[in-house]
Amino acid sequence: MIQQERFLKIIEYLKEHQTATLNEIAALNGVSVDTVRRDLEQLENSGMLKRVRGGAVYHNADFATQTFDIRSIANRDAKRELVELLGAFVVDGQTVALNSGTTSIEAAKFLVENYYRLTVLTNNIHVLEVLASARKFTTIVPGGIVDPAEGAIFGDQCERDILKYNIDTAILAVHALSFEKGVTDFRLNQAGIIRAMMEAARQKIFIADHSKFGRIACMNVCGIDEMETIISDSAFPEEFRPEFTARGVKVITPK
């Protein structure tokens, strides 16, 4: 079992049980107690749990403190579920934009599995790897500065390059969404990228799993009135739907 799979099983177990002993985690993942200790140390450093004598307790860390690798396994099933709904909005032959973020990776995998003739513009290096391996699409990568921690390109040059293209559909993964502030992001260097993709796109689809709603991050991206469609998973907090509808935003979730 690879490390990320072990991390996911540990986090899901702690979400359900709140605590776990070293031996319980060792049995869960089929590894030694020494391996468990190393895994718990990394997860604690990422803010996902707190180590205690003989085990660990769950800690629901703020997403701004989580590393990209940890974010990539958090709510993975929800992300995979929601991207299945993109099929109603993307047509083969279109030009599509994908921004940085872990949900964008799942979106890229969905596109690779279901389409043949897309042109994809992305500043997400992880998405680029998915697309390059598939060898199916025309892929456009804007220039700029690389953020190695996020695996994403940013900067004025990146934003200018994006604005050179006419994008049919921008698929925009977001990190926080509230009625008070709209879309916000903890990644200061990515807000301008999202804005550029919005400006260049005819259709804007925001993708966010259920954990992103009711949160506010430090950087403003756009208001609710600038949104058209949100895709979320089956655990979407339904108490948010009436307000989105009243403000002209469609919320698409699995039936």
Map each language-model feature to its residues.
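Conserved phosphate- and dinucleotide-binding cores of soluble alpha/beta proteins
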Residues: 2-12, 19-25, 30, 78, ...
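Hydrophobic/small residue at the entry helix of a nucleotide-binding pocket
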Residues: 103
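Short glycine-enriched loops at secondary-structure junctions
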Residues: 55, 126-127
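N-terminal active-site wall of soluble small-molecule enzyme domains
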Residues: 106
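HTH-adjacent hinge/linker in prokaryotic transcriptional regulators
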Residues: 2-29, 34-100, 109-119, 132-137
